[in-house]
């Protein structure tokens, strides 16, 4: 199911404050730092990179190449510490190689900043 680009703002404004940019992003045609408007094909230079969440740009070849893997692992809760899978083990192995310093032996994954702070406080209280 898909909504026609011409109807996007009308539909969104029924349930949300739809006061964002007038552009309707074409998720398939946007590329690098360019947002393509689905209605007319016009390209706009993205000067805010989705507020830093899109720092590598749109449809980066390495992300597109890994789309199947990303879709598959997105169905699994990455912070679940009781059920494991091989993709999670591969991620932790690579993360250990490039991001965990020798003086820290363990990692604790959460799904956001506020949850990270909350769990850091819980850990501090438990291990005081």
Residue ranges, per PLM feature:
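Glycine-rich loop-to-alpha-helix module at the N-terminal edge of alpha/beta enzyme cores
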Residues: 2, 14-15, 43-127
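Short, compositionally biased leader-like segments
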Residues: 1-20
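Short, flexible, glycine/charge-rich loop motifs used to bind or transfer phosphoryl groups or to couple energy/partner
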Residues: 23-24, 97
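Short, basic and Ser/Thr-rich N-terminal targeting/leader segments
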Residues: 20, 28-31, 103
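Active-site and channel-lining beta-strand-loop segments
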Residues: 25-47
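Generic secretory/membrane-interface signal
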Residues: 7-8, 31, 40, 116
């Amino acid at each position: 199911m898909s909504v026609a680009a011409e109807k996007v703002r009308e539909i969104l404004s029924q349930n949300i404050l739809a006061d964002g940019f007038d552009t309707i992003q074409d998720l398939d045609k946007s590329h690098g730092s360019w947002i393509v408007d689905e209605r007319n094909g016009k390209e706009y230079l993205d000067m805010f990179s989705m507020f830093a969440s899109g720092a590598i740009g749109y449809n980066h070849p390495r992300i597109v190449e890994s789309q199947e893997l990303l879709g598959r692992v997105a169905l699994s809760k990455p912070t679940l510490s009781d059920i494991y899978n091989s993709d999670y083990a591969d991620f932790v192995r690579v993360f250990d190689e490039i991001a965990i310093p020798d003086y820290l032996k363990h990692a604790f994954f959460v799904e956001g900043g506020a949850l990270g702070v909350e769990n850091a406080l819980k850990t501090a209280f438990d291990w005081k």
